[in-house]
């Protein structure tokens, strides 16, 4: 029997509606709407599309969105000055710096200068550290979005074997921490992992984020597993494909995310959720 499709678009829309209702209640109570600053450096086409979707999502839920589009030749010191300004702006609850940044700008330095209480991407070492200590506040958007999908579909995590393929700072590493927090036994696979197939065949929950189309053969999937495909890759044909061989995996898995329409929409929805959380918990004066 083919797997049940995990509809990320539907769940993301539900999350946005929930946030919009809370924002409406805030405003009706005389409180200000949450504010999100979106910073884009350069004119990378993919980044422009992502930023546009984030700004649109802000407007839909009633946030105040401030846009800062900087030229590609912006110096690091100039970007840091803007971040420092936004850190002290009491009407800004979240600061989002769209990645990747142009060559010559130290991404780590930029992200570490964002006030951790405005780090709605969840990338700051302080917030990742809180997650590792089981006291999370602002959590990385894609991993948290995946946890939301599992929760909304009532897919059990506690006591299950979760295998994460990919160890990036944006997805793989915080995803491992999220799975630990949820009570899973976790295995994280990366480029030095030997016998990848062996690990994947053990996975009750498989999360793949490597950025290579059809990297995981579908017949490696354990019968009845949950497959979360974070990859989004454009093929020569123009079609989008995930990191997992979808058609074959779907016949073995119990649940599976499609590409597109699975994890992607949840990343933006969680960003919106984080911004409201930052407003309510840190800046609601």
From Swiss-Prot:
Superkingdom, natural source: Bacteria
One cellular-component annotation, GO: cytosol
EC number(s) stated in the UniProt entry for this protein: 1.5.1.5, 3.5.4.9
GO MF annotations in UniProt: methenyltetrahydrofolate cyclohydrolase activity; methylenetetrahydrofolate dehydrogenase (NADP+) activity
Catalytic activity: (6R)-5,10-methylene-5,6,7,8-tetrahydrofolate + NADP(+) = (6R)-5,10-methenyltetrahydrofolate + NADPH; (6R)-5,10-methenyltetrahydrofolate + H2O = (6R)-10-formyltetrahydrofolate + H(+)
Stored InterPro entries: Aminoacid_DH-like_N_sf, NAD(P)-bd_dom_sf, THF_DH/CycHdrlase, THF_DH/CycHdrlase_cat_dom, THF_DH/CycHdrlase_CS, THF_DH/CycHdrlase_NAD-bd_dom
Biological process, per Gene Ontology: L-histidine biosynthetic process; methionine biosynthetic process; purine nucleotide biosynthetic process; tetrahydrofolate interconversion
Residue sites binding NADP(+) per the record: 166-168, 232
Pfam families recorded: THF_DHG_CYH, THF_DHG_CYH_C
Keywords per UniProt: Amino-acid biosynthesis, Histidine biosynthesis, Hydrolase, Methionine biosynthesis, Multifunctional enzyme, NADP, One-carbon metabolism, Oxidoreductase, Purine biosynthesis
Pathways per UniProt: One-carbon metabolism; tetrahydrofolate interconversion
Matches recorded under NCBIfam families: PRK10792.1 (NF008058), PRK14186.1 (NF010783)
HAMAP family in the cross-refs: THF_DHG_CYH (MF_01576)
Assembly mode: Homodimer.
Function of the molecule: Catalyzes the oxidation of 5,10-methylenetetrahydrofolate to 5,10-methenyltetrahydrofolate and then the hydrolysis of 5,10-methenyltetrahydrofolate to 10-formyltetrahydrofolate.
Family under the similarity heading: Belongs to the tetrahydrofolate dehydrogenase/cyclohydrolase family.
Protein name: Bifunctional protein FolD
Protein source organism: Photobacterium profundum (strain SS9)
Species classification: Bacteria, Pseudomonadati, Pseudomonadota, Gammaproteobacteria, Vibrionales
């Amino acid at each position: 029997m083919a797997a049940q499709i995990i509809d990320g678009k539907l769940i993301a829309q539900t999350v946005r509606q929930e946030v919009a209702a809370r924002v409406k209640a805030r405003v009706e109570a005389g409180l200000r709407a949450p504010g999100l600053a979106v910073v884009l450096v350069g004119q990378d086409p993919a980044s422009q599309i992502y930023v546009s979707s984030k700004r649109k999502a802000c407007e839909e839920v009633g946030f105040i969105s401030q846009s800062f589009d900087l030229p590609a030749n912006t110096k690091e010191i100039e970007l840091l000055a803007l971040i420092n300004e936004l850190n002290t702006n009491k009407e800004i609850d979240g600061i989002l710096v769209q990645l990747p940044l142009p060559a010559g700008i130290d991404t780590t330095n930029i992200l570490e200068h964002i006030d951790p209480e405005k780090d709605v991407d969840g990338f700051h070492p302080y917030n990742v550290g809180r997650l590792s200590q089981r006291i999370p506040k602002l959590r990385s958007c894609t991993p948290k979005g995946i946890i939301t999908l599992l929760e909304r579909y009532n897919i059990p995590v506690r006591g299950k074997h979760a295998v994460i393929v990919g160890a990036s700072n944006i997805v793989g590493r915080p995803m491992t921490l999220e799975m630990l927090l949820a009570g899973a036994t976790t295995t994280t696979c990366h480029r030095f992992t030997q016998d990848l197939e062996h690990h994947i065949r053990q996975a009750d929950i498989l999360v793949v984020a490597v950025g290579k189309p059809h990297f995981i053969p579908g017949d490696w999937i354990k019968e009845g597993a949950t497959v979360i495909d974070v990859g989004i890759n454009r093929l020569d044909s123009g079609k989008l494909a995930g990191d997992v061989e979808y058609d074959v995996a779907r016949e073995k898995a119990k649940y599976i995310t499609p590409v597109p329409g699975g994890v992607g929409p949840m990343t933006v929805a969680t960003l919106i959720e984080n911004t409201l959380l930052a407003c309510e918990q840190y800046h609601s004066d």
